């Protein structure tokens, strides 16, 4: 299964500048998913990260992997994005191996390692031109929107 940006927008609550998936190129429900993010110099963070040598922020690679895991969770067991939210609980064994720069096409992949009820654990990788840039283990949960803690 492949998802274009229109279908991604129906699943994820994220919008520009924090929607970090351009296309989901493969989904195997309950198993894995792959997506791409095309990095351009017009990204809003490049003027400050870093002006003389722009690099895609590593924390946004983790966010992109989290978004892809949310799409995989939806494809595995559809939920109503208006009433449910898929959110990140944590990351483990995170490694950043290569910088990502304007002009790169990030290839993202997530693979489910374990699922218990509403908790999902997955392995994620980000590569450019078949060179591994980063990898991490992701832990996330699906919950009712009204059960999320507020900032107060």
What are these regions (language model features)?
Residues 1-2, 69-107, 133-135, 140-141:
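Hydrophobic beta-strand-centered segment that forms part of the acyl-chain substrate-binding groove
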Residues 3-15, 82-83:
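Short aromatic-glycine motifs in intrinsically disordered, low-complexity regions
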Residues 9, 52, 95-98:
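Beta-strand-rich interaction surfaces with strong enrichment in secreted/lumenal proteins
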Residues 13, 30, 100-104, 111-152:
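HotDog/MaoC-like acyl-thioester-processing domains
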Residues 16-56, 61:
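Catalytic strand-loop segment that frames the active site of acyl-thioester-processing enzymes
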Residues 18-20, 106, 120:
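Hydrophobic core residues within well-ordered beta-strands of beta-rich domains
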Residues 23-26, 93, 98, 112-114:
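A residue-level detector for short acidic-glycine micro-motifs
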Residues 49-81:
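Helix-adjacent hinge/juxtasegments
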């Amino acid at each position: 299964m492949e998802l274009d940006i229109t279908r991604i927008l129906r699943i994820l609550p994220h919008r520009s500048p924090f929607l970090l998936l351009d296309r989901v190129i493969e989904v195997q429900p309950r198993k894995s998913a792959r997506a791409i993010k095309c990095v351009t110099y017009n990204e809003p963070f490049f003027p400050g990260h870093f002006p003389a040598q722009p690099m895609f922020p590593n924390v946004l690679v983790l966010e992109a992997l989290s978004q892809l895991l949310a799409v995989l969770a939806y494809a595995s067991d559809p939920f109503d994005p208006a009433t449910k939210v898929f959110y990140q609980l944590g990351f483990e064994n995170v490694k950043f191996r290569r910088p990502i720069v304007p002009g790169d096409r990030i290839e993202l992949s997530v693979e489910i390692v374990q699922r218990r009820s509403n908790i999902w654990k997955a392995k994620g990788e980000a590569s450019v031109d078949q060179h591994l840039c980063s990898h991490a283990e992701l832990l996330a949960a699906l919950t009712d929107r009204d059960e999320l803690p507020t900032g107060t």
